[in-house]
């Protein structure tokens, strides 16, 4: 049974955005194409997206 959320699209968008940010940041770090400060900034943004998704899930 799928959960019924009023904010399904927002939740999905936030999770997909966070996943993509983390994936791209990890790849750039592995390839040495990003500095630590930028990587941390990107990961902080991804965390905010996940926190947003959590908020909307709890609002349900």
Question: Where on the chain are the PLM-derived regions?
Answer:
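Short intrinsically disordered terminal tails
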Residues: 1-4, 58-60
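Short, charge-rich amphipathic interface segments used for partner binding and complex assembly
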Residues: 9-60
């Amino acid at each position: 049974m799928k959960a019924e959320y009023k904010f399904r699209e927002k939740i999905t968008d936030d999770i997909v955005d966070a996943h993509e940010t983390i994936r791209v940041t990890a790849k750039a770090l592995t390839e040495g194409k990003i500095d630590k400060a930028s990587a941390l900034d990107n990961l902080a943004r991804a965390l905010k997206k996940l926190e947003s998704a959590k908020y909307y899930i709890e609002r349900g």
